[in-house]
């Protein structure tokens, strides 16, 4: 079945699953992302861990698909032959955590010193803005791939810095600012990305009016 992006380019999945290897272990003091797993897969894995333990109910939103061509090899069967990914209108994840509506994006960069705004879209910023106005807990999980560092960064700060672009502001968020204003997450065994610990701090900061 052929899938296409909204710009008409064909979709190809270059990710390959790596078999688990036995033997050599990394240092017990340092944990990195699970080998062969993308950031999205790591978060999905963590969300499942949280759901199974009744800690939170958070899911990845499905990507809308527009079906273009369908074949009917039999009257009771339908086979999708061609489809397009529609442009997403909101963010990657949402759900409920301790009575709070949670909404967030997951982004990664190969940069080492800043996180570029080109990773975001205006519709995502607008969605964050609307959710915050309703009292939602909104943030971005940012990953600096070369550094293997993860952060929960408040959407309120992202929106302010995004808006500042129009008046000559930076086109990226410096790593130093993310370290100062965000919440760093350390990889661990289960869940691999324990981001709810950072969300607790984000909620506490909000209640203090910081």
Swiss-Prot record:
<feature type="binding site">
    <location>
        <position position="92"/>
    </location>
    <ligand>
        <name>Mg(2+)</name>
    </ligand>
</feature>
<dbReference type="InterPro" id="IPR004612">
    <property type="entry name" value="Resolv_RecU"/>
</dbReference>
<dbReference type="GO" id="GO:0005737">
    <property type="term" value="C:cytoplasm"/>
</dbReference>
<feature type="binding site">
    <location>
        <position position="124"/>
    </location>
    <ligand>
        <name>Mg(2+)</name>
    </ligand>
</feature>
<keyword id="KW-0234">DNA repair</keyword>
<dbReference type="GO" id="GO:0000287">
    <property type="term" value="F:magnesium ion binding"/>
</dbReference>
<dbReference type="GO" id="GO:0007059">
    <property type="term" value="P:chromosome segregation"/>
</dbReference>
<dbReference type="GO" id="GO:0006281">
    <property type="term" value="P:DNA repair"/>
</dbReference>
<dbReference type="Pfam" id="PF03838">
    <property type="entry name" value="RecU"/>
</dbReference>
<feature type="site" description="Transition state stabilizer">
    <location>
        <position position="107"/>
    </location>
</feature>
<dbReference type="InterPro" id="IPR011335">
    <property type="entry name" value="Restrct_endonuc-II-like"/>
</dbReference>
<dbReference type="GO" id="GO:0003676">
    <property type="term" value="F:nucleic acid binding"/>
</dbReference>
<keyword id="KW-0479">Metal-binding</keyword>
<dbReference type="InterPro" id="IPR011856">
    <property type="entry name" value="tRNA_endonuc-like_dom_sf"/>
</dbReference>
<feature type="binding site">
    <location>
        <position position="105"/>
    </location>
    <ligand>
        <name>Mg(2+)</name>
    </ligand>
</feature>
<keyword id="KW-0378">Hydrolase</keyword>
<comment type="function">
    <text>Endonuclease that resolves Holliday junction intermediates in genetic recombination. Cleaves mobile four-strand junctions by introducing symmetrical nicks in paired strands. Promotes annealing of linear ssDNA with homologous dsDNA. Required for DNA repair, homologous recombination and chromosome segregation.</text>
</comment>
<keyword id="KW-0255">Endonuclease</keyword>
<dbReference type="GO" id="GO:0006310">
    <property type="term" value="P:DNA recombination"/>
</dbReference>
<comment type="similarity">
    <text>Belongs to the RecU family.</text>
</comment>
<feature type="region of interest" description="Disordered">
    <location>
        <begin position="1"/>
        <end position="34"/>
    </location>
</feature>
<keyword id="KW-0963">Cytoplasm</keyword>
<keyword id="KW-0460">Magnesium</keyword>
<keyword id="KW-0233">DNA recombination</keyword>
<keyword id="KW-0227">DNA damage</keyword>
<dbReference type="GO" id="GO:0004519">
    <property type="term" value="F:endonuclease activity"/>
</dbReference>
<keyword id="KW-0540">Nuclease</keyword>
<protein>
    <recommendedName>
        <fullName>Holliday junction resolvase RecU</fullName>
        <ecNumber>3.1.21.10</ecNumber>
    </recommendedName>
</protein>
<feature type="binding site">
    <location>
        <position position="90"/>
    </location>
    <ligand>
        <name>Mg(2+)</name>
    </ligand>
</feature>
């Amino acid at each position: 079945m052929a899938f296409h992006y909204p710009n008409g380019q064909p979709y190809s999945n270059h990710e390959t699953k790596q078999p688990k290897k036995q033997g050599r272990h990394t240092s017990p003091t340092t944990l990195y992302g699970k080998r062969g797993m993308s950031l999205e897969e790591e978060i999905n894995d963590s969300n499942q861990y949280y759901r199974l333990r009744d800690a939170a109910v958070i899911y990845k939103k499905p990507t809308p698909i527009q079906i273009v061509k369908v074949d009917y090899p039999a009257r009771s069967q339908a086979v999708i032959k061609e489809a397009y990914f529609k442009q997403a209108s909101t963010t990657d994840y949402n759900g409920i955590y301790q009575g709070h509506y949670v909404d967030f994006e997951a982004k990664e960069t190969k940069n080492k010193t800043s996180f570029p705004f080109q990773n975001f879209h205006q519709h995502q910023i607008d969605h964050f803005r609307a959710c915050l106005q309703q009292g939602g807990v909104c943030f971005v999980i940012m990953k600096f791939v070369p550094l293997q560092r993860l952060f929960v960064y408040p959407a309120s700060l992202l929106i302010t810095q995004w808006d500042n672009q129009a008046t000559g502001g930076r086109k990226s968020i410096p790593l130093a600012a993310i370290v100062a204003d965000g919440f760093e997450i350390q990889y661990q065994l289960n869940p691999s990305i324990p981001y709810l610990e950072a969300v607790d701090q984000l909620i506490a900061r909000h209640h203090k009016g910081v």
